[in-house]
Amino acid sequence: MHKDQEKPIKLLLTWAGSDKWYLLASVFCAFLSGLFVIGPYVGIYHLMDAVLLGTLTRKGLTDCIVLVSVTTVFRMVLLGLSGVLSHKGAYNALFRVRCMIIEKLAKVPLGYVSERSTGEIKTVLNENIEKLELCLAHNIPELVSYLTGPVVIFLYLMTVNIPLALISLIPLLLDIPVMMAVFQKMSALLPETNESLADFNSVMVEYVRGMRLIKAYRMGSKSFKKFREAILDENRAWNKIAKKTAPLYAVFILLLESGLLLLVPLGGRLFLHGSIPASVFLLFSYIGSLYLTELLPLQQLSGNFAQAFSGMNKVKEILALPTFEGGDAFPESHDIRLKGVRFSYDGKINVLENANLSIRDGEKIAVVGA
């Protein structure tokens, strides 16, 4: 498969090299951490059930406390271990990617570097690659952890009552199109944001270099029009993202937390008709309406993934540049000959055409333009 056609996650692991094993170990720890999410839910459910039925004993209370405490401790320990492993692998991978870009820039034609501002290249090396750290060290392990917990709880609910368990999934099914819409909007708006950030970095470098003149003439930031406009453009870009995605985020939260509106009426009806006992009704009223809230951070992750993939595209653009291949033997003759050279500033009108020039070894020639 061509490198440009590789899936983003696979490409990130390819760039990580041998450090990908830290990232995979981090994902495994995050998966184990997600398995322990069910502990507190089950423990508190058994405690509430025992209190309502009047069967609570000291041993039952102790068992619930131990279950909640042990599963919570194990979850936090595994989550912390996942974070350590992911950061170790992520920062090593970022170092490797930055080295790849620097080595690439050292071999590309000089025209590429001269045609791009310092701020644009700085944006790729700093901001765009830094977004990859957020993806590798946080988003991927968190995605696994956030998905594992609800899946385990859903499987547990399926063993209790299949119809009510399936009903509890309705809010999630309604939310999937919302999440996809947010990801698409972020992906469409991020190129504009990256462009404004690159312009901002370019103007910032120029502003810092001219700081002595600004102080000498007692000029403020408002008098430096390009600097002010760059700040406003960056602000406008992020305000646009907020206005486009905020309504969808509100819809996402409302739908995800609407399980109670479905489970309580339907579960209550089944309970009144004797189809389910009170403990099952309590279980779905408590756990069935809450376990999907574990997926709330996924909405933020969709935006983070969009930013990371946008940064990856910038990195891929540089890595895909053609390189200047040397390796030929040094010529014995040091003469310089230009034959039939033409040049145009705009690509349409030639300002230099059919120019021929011969400079012998050791000869000095000055070219003066009119």
Q: Which role fits each region the language model picked out?
A:
Residues 1-37, 53-64, 82-86, 90, ...:
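Membrane-integrated ABC transporters
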Residues 36-45, 71-114, 118, 122, ...:
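Juxtamembrane helix-loop junctions of ABC transporter transmembrane domains
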Residues 219, 243, 291-318:
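Cytosolic ends of transmembrane helices, especially the final helix of ABC transmembrane type-1 domains
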